[in-house]
């Protein structure tokens, strides 16, 4: 996102109104106001277990809120839960989440942080990056027992997902009961003034607030934001559900994705992903949905790709929407070594090489379900092959409405 000047000495009430935009829970507004009135930069924490290294616009909702704190002169702490990822956060889950190794968590964190930098300020006074293994690995058994003694099992089991699992007879492991305490202890270690999270993290963040009091600290303010609903209009945005728009998507792909946002979600997307004033949002929502989608797409793409040619992205979207094939499709080189003895290569393998599917099995399923086109025509043979001659000339394959690849034989 484009860097702006840090706005210091903004009136307290103005800061509160800006920071409340899009917020679901604020515990409490009075505490936040009192902390800001002290005139010192707040320490604003966001904890993330790097289980998936690729971020999407759903993650951007909270990262944008962190950026707002930064732009007001506060310091945000990006806490990588490399240690807690080895436990597995059960928040909002109907079953135990498989843990990661420390090595896996730290490898994922590198990609995670690189994408966070698309939104967050990088100045040392605005950003601090920490790993909770710094202090959690140092805790001994006595420390853990002491931490566990500060909360009752009854209070932990008040959490909605645990209640549902108990009712369903689904097992809950002891390590899962410790997770909220472990996450809460992070706030103690960091002396956090504010903690951000999705609505599914409200319970855990309130545990942190309570633990800070137990450890003689001033309790953090807890601020939660909604989980962005994905392009399917029903489930939260998720890569595994393929209803997402990635933070690193090309401008044309991001534009096309935003044009597909279901009409009932436009208000939410405008509020959470843009800085447009409320009056302008209501004006757009009262008009034609296509115009509102266009404004949303241009605003969001401009934020993540300040130098992008928005007119070109829109023109490509319109061309594809009419069934056309764009001119500037990225070329994918097909190594000659992929050809068999007859000079053929399977379409499934080409789909994987183009990055349209992760595996040959997924590619064959895509083809079988008539989700792939070759040269604008539906391609439906999951065992089909292309020839050396076809690839030498170059062919265009298409998944869905807006994912294209031009395949050309290397050399």
Curated annotation (Swiss-Prot):
Residues 345-409 form the S4 RNA-binding domain. InterPro entries: aa-tRNA-synth_Ic, Rossmann-like_a/b/a_fold, S4_RNA-bd_sf, SYY-like_C, Tyr-tRNA-ligase, Tyr-tRNA-ligase_bac-type, Tyr-tRNA-ligase_bac_2. GO terms for biological process: tRNA aminoacylation; tyrosyl-tRNA aminoacylation. Keywords: Aminoacyl-tRNA synthetase, ATP-binding, Cytoplasm, Ligase, Nucleotide-binding, Protein biosynthesis, RNA-binding. It is found in: Cytoplasm. Belongs to the class-I aminoacyl-tRNA synthetase family. TyrS type 2 subfamily. This is Tyrosine--tRNA ligase. It comes from Deinococcus radiodurans (strain ATCC 13939 / DSM 20539 / JCM 16871 / CCUG 27074 / LMG 4051 / NBRC 15346 / NCIMB 9279 / VKM B-1422 / R1). The lineage of its organism: Bacteria, Thermotogati, Deinococcota, Deinococci, Deinococcales.
